[in-house]
């Protein structure tokens, strides 16, 4: 979120219920298919506050919050830029 001058950023990390995920397919109707870091494939919903403000594409790294009552669905809570995703890979947070 803030740049420390060394090319590194303090990135938003997953909170209690969130997991890293990679977008694998665009489904339409504000939904995407994601492969989560916990090994699950989920259908994720893009909430209204993100629509038309934050564009999500295939292969983007996002944070999702799985639903409590239906484990194969989730909500997208954050999208990382490409440089941020590269930093997460370098630091070992994602593969």
Swiss-Prot record:
Family the UniProt entry places it in: Belongs to the eIF-1A family.
Location of the S1-like domain: 7-81
GO MF annotations in UniProt: RNA binding; translation initiation factor activity
Coiled coil segments of this chain: none
Protein name (Swiss-Prot/TrEMBL): Translation initiation factor 1A 1
Keyword presence, Protein biosynthesis: yes
Function text: Seems to be required for maximal rate of protein biosynthesis. Enhances ribosome dissociation into subunits and stabilizes the binding of the initiator Met-tRNA(I) to 40 S ribosomal subunits.
